[in-house]
Amino acid sequence: MPVNLYYTQRVRGFQQESVKYSKESVEIRLKRTKHQCPHCGSTSVTVEPIRSRRIRGEPLGSCRKVALEFTIHRLYCHSCHHREIEHIPFLSHPKARLTKALERTILELRPHISIQALANFYDLRWHTIKELEKKHLKKKYSRIQTAHIKAIGIDEIHIGKGMQNQQYLTIVRDLQSGAVIHVGDGKGISALAITCQF
């Protein structure tokens, strides 16, 4: 049984229409296999093509540039009368330019490789990888469960001279995870007023 190239990109719900090869790149054109309403699951939908998307996928062998092309559709459900732009399951958000699989690979390699080395290897912009890492860290540390905090560390740092006096920040961290719990202006007890509420 032949394995289609788009399976290596962890793409489901699409089929391969065409493939173009060159020395350093592969372009895979995809087509949705079945359209259904995301709310009621009905397949009785009207499909309206909106635009074509081109995103980057994981490298295949010596081909570092893998492009996936597909058309985004607007769906109208005849059962529940809901109108919505279709969800693409292999993208982390509607405006993503990389597949979830490539994003995951970059995030797994990032602790071991510099941003510039990853950008050079995948032929991406430095800012693309930096933004991906920032988004991941924000998601990871945005929801800190204060019930699980066993020990905190409080640090006051000098950030420079202001108009009339010295300026400080007070940083409160969870010592186990290293997550920042609170950043307060100034130093002393007044900078910790919000933190003490948990």
Report the location of each language-model feature.
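Short linear motifs at secondary-structure transitions and domain/linker junctions
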Residues: 2-7, 11-13, 43-44, 50-54, ...
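Glycine-rich loops and low-complexity Gly/Arg-rich segments
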Residues: 52-55, 64, 101-103, 176-180, ...
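A short, sequence-level motif marking secondary-structure junctions
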Residues: 33, 91, 186-190
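Short, low-complexity, polar/charged sequence segments that are solvent-exposed and flexible
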Residues: 46-50, 87, 96, 170-174, ...
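RNase H-like nuclease fold core
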Residues: 134-198
